From Swiss-Prot, chain A:
Main location: membrane
Regulation: Regulated by guanine nucleotide exchange factors (GEFs) DENND4C and RABIF which promote the exchange of bound GDP for free GTP. Regulated by GTPase activating proteins (GAPs) including TBC1D21 which increase the GTP hydrolysis activity. Inhibited by GDP dissociation inhibitors GDI1 and GDI2 which prevent Rab-GDP dissociation.
Tissues and organs where the protein is expressed, per its UniProt entry: Expressed in the hippocampus. Expressed in neutrophils (at protein level). Expressed in the testis (at protein level).
SUPFAM superfamilies xref list: P-loop containing nucleoside triphosphate hydrolases
Impact after mutating residue 73 to A: Loss of phosphorylation. No effect on GDI1 and GDI2 binding. Increases localization to the cytosol. Does not translocate to LRRK2-positive lysosomes and does not promote lysosomal content release
Enzyme class: hydrolase
Residue ranges annotated as motif Switch 1: 32-46
Protein name: Ras-related protein Rab-10
Example GO molecular function: GDP binding
From Swiss-Prot, chain B:
Gene designation: EXOC6B
Domain of life: Eukaryota
Native organism taxonomy: Eukaryota, Metazoa, Chordata, Craniata, Vertebrata
GO biological process: exocytosis; Golgi to plasma membrane transport; intracellular protein transport; membrane fission; mitotic cytokinesis; vesicle docking involved in exocytosis; vesicle tethering involved in exocytosis
Protein name per the record: Exocyst complex component 6B
Region forming the signal peptide: none
């Protein structure tokens, strides 16, 4: 029998306006790298990183989406398969924060009902250019019952914490496997319990 | 009878002797009578002598008596006369005494006056003698005083002349005086003092020219610069005229200096006139900064003192030392242009001074000496420049340095120094300059590529459109007609790289100015450098970006598009070079640009990287594969990981529509082949020791998903089933096993048109073995015992036949 190199596979999705730093957040987490030049993502891309939580090897397949409207059709087709979604805005760009409500509606429309969500306010290292107060982010997260982190891909602030927290939340909702039972591909089933945790 | 004669003879002798003795007694002093008398007593004639003596005494008494008798009366008269005189004398005595007393009393003052007169006469004589002596000494003292004044006012040459005069003309006349001896003793010391002071002046002079070398050189370089500027406007004549004028001024100074040291001038107080004249004159260059008179004076002084050779040797020795100091570059000279400029100024200043000395003195320095010094200087300078210029990493500094070296060479050439070696070295520096430029442009290209956003350039107005088209020679009628906003196909780095290549060409051209190269040489050099820029520097920059760890498909696709456009622009670069060098492309031996090769290579590398990148993504999906090789269940849909994989490929090719058609096709084919190969390996890998028909059927569903993707035409341009051929091996293998069509396979094996042409018997055997193991393991199921036994027999039979095929194939 072929041996798997992981215990569980979690599929995560990054969404948000173009230019808020989704790709940079992903690169910081997967490769601990940062590129100062803004290169617009075309279509869809992904990175895979294996982490260990509660003694289990979990593969995180993280999909990075293009924020531009012209790629909307392609990117929304990936919502259905996601187990966790990160909504990213830029604290120095008020428009990107205002559009969070639009992205939340997209999730409701295209994603599984029980998908785990998280709000990220990126570029928190640029406090001198801040236009979105942290309190605003906290407020909208509270209203929607989701977790919130301010992050900086450039300064490597809260990046790993955000991903691991999201993974832990997903793991908490995953049924515990019986010893020696057949391995089941979680993503192939639709039977994940649908309760949603509240954050404060 | 004989005895009687003899006695008579003796008596005569004795008588004579006695007579002699008597005369001696009468004439000799009493003190000497002793020896005489002793001689009498020594003889035997004492008695006879006494007789004669008595006789002579009586004779003398009778003579006296007669005389007294004869003069008795006169005597008496005289006595009487004398007694009278005595009385008169007494009277006279009294009278004289009285007169004397009166005279003494009356003439006392006269005596005093006489004494005073006597003293005055004595003094007068002394004074007269003194004056006579002083008249002899005065010129000496005057000369000595003059000498001292001249020494004090540091007019040493006149002082030396005065000293000579004093020594040979004046001092001999009064050499017996002590102070003159002191002077004579001091003359050698004074002469030495003049020498020492002159030498001290010379040392000050040497220090002065050392200190001002920088200024002198700077002035000379500026004059050469001005001259060059003039040469660009007018004929060569002004240069010659300027040079003549400079020489003329130098000679004027020389004449003036000679005059100022001549005795005639000295006597006529000519120095003042000459000095005034000097002040009025405007002397260019070195004259304004340095007073050369000390060296002239010192030279004359040493010549007069007969030590000219010593002076020459000392001067040349000191100047050689100074030359070595001047030629010692500062350790950080290469850091700034000012470092080099100061170095050159010092060298130029040194040789300008030597040239001046050469032309204004008689043999203090000669052409051979200066040439030797220059040869040493040239080799040291060139060595220093080679060393320090190799540290330069700033092409602007190298370029400025080249201009400075040209100016340095031109300046010294005006003074008659050969400078060909400097121009030869400049060609070496040019090569280094090219290297420096290449390094600089490597940095520039890296910055451009790093900061590019790898997106087509958007333009929202006609103005912006024209700006981009002005920077990069791009012509597209279709794009031109489109309404705004619209996009150029290439990203920002295309016009930027193009412009930087042109800037590089300009920079190469700049260095060639003033190097006396022909247009063809310049053109050749520029093309060679540009080829290096394109084939090495830019190529490396592009390759580095393409090979970067996190390079994405976005960047790779845009690089392919960009390099296509840059390749087309190479012909315009050719035209650009032709325009600035005025060398026609058809000229024989003209170097060609090889830039197109660079862009082709970069494009190929990017394409390869796209294929690699896609395949890596496929591998990441495959690592998620989670087959249950022992399943008995029959699934009804493809594996989740594979569905995601196919969806990813589909969306990727959907969004990169701007990828050139052939590249897209190749990428798609490469991905499908890689996927098929990977799936086959997955099926056959040793770790999968057993598998069931159910597992095969699930696997088959996945392969069908792939085939569906291939049939769907993800990339335009493929023939109907070309892409699907990537999966044909898998398809035939799976069909063979699922349909258990061994009769057909074994019967048709080796036929050109057989149904399972692409199934390798080794592969089939490997897979069959995995299924046989499965069957054995299931023997314990009693209810299927018979069927399983039959199946096992069949598997064994087929395996045996396959081995036979393999064996016969090998033999």
């Amino acid at each position: 029998m072929a041996k798997k190199t992981y215990d569980l596979l979690f599929k995560l999705l990054l969404i948000g306006d173009s230019g808020v730093g989704k790709t940079c957040v992903l690169f910081r987490f997967s490769d601990d790298a940062f590129n100062t030049t803004f290169i617009s993502t075309i279509g869809i891309d992904f990175k895979i990183k294996t982490v260990e939580l509660q003694g289990k090897k979990i593969k995180l397949q993280i999909w990075d989406t293009a924020g531009q409207e012209r790629f909307h059709t392609i990117t929304t087709s990936y919502y259905r398969g996601a187990m966790g979604i990160m909504l990213v805005y830029d604290i120095t760009n008020g428009k990107s924060f205002e559009n969070i409500s639009k992205w939340l509606r997209n999730i409701d429309e295209h994603a599984n009902e029980d998908v785990e969500r998280m709000l990220l306010g990126n570029k928190c290292d640029m406090d001198d250019k801040r236009v979105v107060p942290k309190g605003k982010g906290e407020q909208i997260a509270r209203e929607h019952g989701i977790r919130f982190f301010e992050t900086s891909a450039k300064a490597n602030i809260n990046i790993e914490k955000a991903f691991l927290t999201l993974a832990e939340d997903i793991l908490r909702k995953t049924p515990v496997k019986e010893p020696n039972s057949e391995n089941v591909d979680i993503s192939s089933g639709g039977g994940v319990t649908g309760w949603k945790s509240k954050c404060c | 009878m004989e005895r009687g004669k003899m006695a008579e003879a003796e008596s005569l002798e004795t008588a004579a002797e006695h007579e002699r003795i008597l005369r001696e007694i009468e004439s000799t002093d009493t003190a000497c009578i002793g020896p005489t008398l002793r001689s009498v007593y020594d003889g035997e004639e004492h008695g006879r002598f006494m007789e004669k003596l008595e006789t002579r005494i009586r004779n003398h008494d009778r003579e006296i008596e007669k005389m007294c008798n004869f003069h008795y009366q006169g005597f008496v008269d005289s006595i009487t006369e004398l007694l009278k005189v005595r009385g008169e004398a007494q009277k006279l005595k009294n009278q004289v005494t009285d007169t004397n007393r009166k005279l003494q009393h009356e003439g006392k003052e006269l005596v005093i006056a006489m004494e005073e007169l006597k003293q005055c006469r004595l003094q007068q004589r002394n004074i007269s003698a003194t004056v006579d002596k002083l008249m002899l000494c005065l010129p000496v003292l005057e000369m000595y005083s003059k000498l001292r004044d001249q020494m004090k006012t540091k007019r040493h040459y006149p002082a030396l002349k005065t000293l000579e005069h004093l020594e040979h003309t004046y001092l001999p006349q009064v050499s017996h005086y002590r102070f003159c001896k002191v002077m004579v003793d001091n003359i050698p010391k004074l002469r030495e003092e003049i020498k020492d002071v002159s030498m001290s002046d010379l040392k000050d002079f040497l220090e002065s020219i050392r200190k001002h070398s920088d200024k002198i050189g700077e002035t000379a370089m500026k004059q050469a610069q001005q001259q060059r500027n003039l040469d660009n406007i007018v004929l060569q004549q002004p240069r010659i005229g300027s040079k003549r004028k400079s020489k003329k001024d130098a000679y004027i100074i020389f004449d003036t200096e000679i005059e100022s040291t001549s005795p005639k001038s000295e006597q006529d107080s000519g120095i003042l006139d000459v000095e005034d004249e000097e002040d009025d004159e405007e002397v260019p260059g070195a004259q304004d900064l340095v007073d050369f008179s000390p060296v002239y004076r010192c030279l004359h002084i040493y010549s007069v003192l007969g030590a000219r050779e010593t002076f020459e040797n000392y001067y040349r020795k000191q100047r050689r030392k100074q030359a070595r100091l001047v030629l010692q570059p500062p350790s950080n000279m290469h850091e700034t242009l000012d470092g080099y400029r100061k170095y050159f100024n010092q060298i130029v200043g040194f040789f300008v001074v030597e040239d001046h000395i050469l032309h204004t003195t008689q043999g203090l320095v000669n052409r051979a000496y200066i040439d030797e010094l220059w040869e040493m200087a040239l080799s040291k300078t060139i060595a220093a420049l080679r060393t320090h210029s190799s540290y330069c990493s700033d092409p602007n500094l190298v370029l400025d340095l080249k201009n400075l070296i040209v100016l340095f060479a031109d300046t010294l050439q005006v003074y008659g120094f050969p400078v060909n070696q400097l121009f030869d070295m400049l060609l070496e520096i040019r090569d280094q300059y090219s290297e420096t430029l290449l390094k600089k442009w490597a940095g520039i290209f890296r910055n451009i590529l790093d900061s590019d956003n790898y997106s087509p350039i958007p333009v929202t107005s006609e103005e912006m459109y024209k700006k981009v088209v002005g920077q990069f020679p791009f012509q597209d009628i279709e794009l031109e007609k489109q309404p705004f906003p619209k996009k150029f196909p290439f990203s920002e780095f295309v016009p930027k790289v193009y412009n930087q290549i042109k800037e590089f060409i300009y920079a190469c051209l700049k260095f060639s100015e003033d190097l006396h190269l022909s247009s063809t040489e310049v053109d050749d050099m520029i093309r060679k450098s540009t080829n290096l820029l394109l084939t090495r520097t830019l190529s490396n920059s592009l390759q580095n970006v393409i090979k970067r760890k996190n390079i994405g498909l976005t960047e790779l696709v845009q690089i392919i598009i960009n390099t296509t456009h840059l390749e087309k622009s190479c012909k315009y670069l050719e035209e650009f070079i032709t325009n600035i060098t005025n060398v026609l492309p058809e000229t024989v031996h003209t170097t060609k640009l090889y830039g197109t090769t660079t862009f082709k290579d970069a494009r190929h590398a990017a394409e390869e990287e796209i294929y690699t990148n896609l395949n890596q993504k496929i591998d990441q999906f495959l690592q998620l594969a989670d087959y249950d090789w022992m399943t008995g269940d029959l699934g009804n849909k493809a594996s989740d990981y594979l569905v995601d994989l196919i969806a990813f490929l589909r969306s990727t090719f959907a969004v990169f529509t701007h990828l050139p058609g052939k590249v897209a096709q190749t990428a798609c084919m490469s991905a499908c082949k890689h996927l098929a190969t990977s799936l086959m390996q997955l099926l056959l890998e040793a770790e999968v020791r057993q598998l069931t028909l159910g597992a095969l059927q699930q696997f088959n569903l996945d392969v069908r998903e792939c085939e569906q993707f291939a049939r769907s035409g993800p990339v335009p341009g493929f023939q109907e089933d070309t892409l699907q051929l990537a999966f044909i091996d898998l398809r035939q293998l799976l069909d063979l096993f699922i349909q258990w069509d061994w009769s057909t396979y074994l019967a048709d094996y080796g036929q050109p048109n057989c149904k399972y042409l692409r199934v390798n018997p080794v592969t089939a055997l490997t897979l069959l073995e995995k299924m046989k193991d499965t069957s054995r393991k299931n023997n314990m199921f009693a209810q299927f015992r018979k069927n399983e036994r039959d199946k096992q027999k069949l598997i064994d039979t087929v395996a045996k036949q396959l081995r036979g095929l393999i064996s016969s194939h090998h033999s």
